[in-house]
Amino acid sequence: MLVLVVNCGSSSIKYQVREVTPEGSEPSPYTSSMPAINENIPLATATAGMAGDQVITKGLIENIGTSEIQDHTQALEILARRLDEELGGRTIDAAGHRVVHGGERFSAPVLVNNEIIRAIERLAPLAPLHNPAHALGLRAIQKTYPGMPQVCVFDTAFHRTMPEKAWRYAIPEQWYEMDGMRRYGFHGTSHDYVTGKACEFLGIPREQFNTVVAHLGNGASVTAIREGRSYDTSMGYTPLAGLVMGTRSGDLDPSVVTAMLERKPGMSAQDMNRILNNESGLQGICGDSDMRAVEQRADSGDERAQLALDMAAYRLAKYIGGYHVAVGGAQALIFTAGIGENSPGFRALVCDQLGALGVRLDASRNEHPEGNVARISFPDSAVEVLVVATDEERAIAEATAALVWERVKN
């Protein structure tokens, strides 16, 4: 089965076409008559028995709305022509979409119909920069590929298993009831995917696996995984909460926001949102948001860069310690995503602070991890330390194929 994986932004479409084959079965072309939608199949269950590691083609369409490409429909038409040429007449069987916010409704991947698209649009206040664009992409594919099944995979869905004590904020009840103010969590597809890969590597049944996953990119989050499910996570109502990130502040005393708004009469809520999301984090501390550049500066003796690294590592180490308690003793610590997979220096800076947990990092293995899943701790480390390559597009492709294939079989 050929699956088009799309990530629609407000002015861009990032895409991959992947070959996904249900084990023991031949791929099947899609049908335009799909049975009922199921919103309760977990991603880990949906993708069982799927192999989606072959990328046929990938690319990016940019400047939608600010160039000759007027809207997402036109962008998808251009993409369809491009894919016709690149695929040599092969047919796209289904499309899988990354959707940032599924709110409280969506706890698993879903097959798309018009009501699902409207539900995603209604969640726009929770992700105003993302969900409207996702809906545009869904409708554009409906027009470009009539009848082709589409599946949405939600960044927030994996975290729907958190207990209420973890996702509730200690704020007035009506703020939650009326305005949806609660912890949602993000990067769920990645956290879910690497947890599964770690289980396979360690030979531990998922329902018996307790771990802490650190997804470290320019945006970063850490998740407590208890019995294979999300139990707590650092991001909150928005992706601003939690760790020190490239340009995001992470956790902050709310009084800082109110005090600055009072002291700066001309500052708006929009200004504050921009500053905390785009001008803070590593950028705010040392003037650079790129971890590689910050590490290079620190190595050359730059004190501000070293402070930025120390703050980011300390914040993460504190979360890991707390989540070790939350899961009842982590069997593994997993590093993933751009920084997590590619920065041995930052991994060491974090793990050096975890001696109280019995973590013992093997410096040689940490410098040169091998394979998509690598153990970088000593054999006598009380907590296994792993580097696991994430692949959110593969997870989306496999979830898409699983739902479509199940409906075709039934």
Curated annotation (Swiss-Prot):
InterPro entries: Ac/propionate_kinase, Aliphatic_acid_kin_short-chain, Aliphatic_acid_kinase_CS, ATPase_NBD. Mg(2+) binds at residues 7, 392. Mg(2+). Can also accept Mn(2+). Homodimer. It is an enzyme of class 2 (transferase). The gene is ackA. The keyword Nucleotide-binding applies. The record marks 187, 248 as: Transition state stabilizer. The active site is at 155 (proton donor/acceptor). Its cofactor is Mg(2+); Mn(2+). Belongs to the acetokinase family. SUPFAM superfamilies: Actin-like ATPase domain. Its EC number is 2.7.2.1. The keyword Cytoplasm applies. PROSITE patterns: ACETATE_KINASE_1, ACETATE_KINASE_2. This is Acetate kinase. Pfam families: Acetate_kinase. GO terms for biological process: acetate metabolic process; acetyl-CoA biosynthetic process.
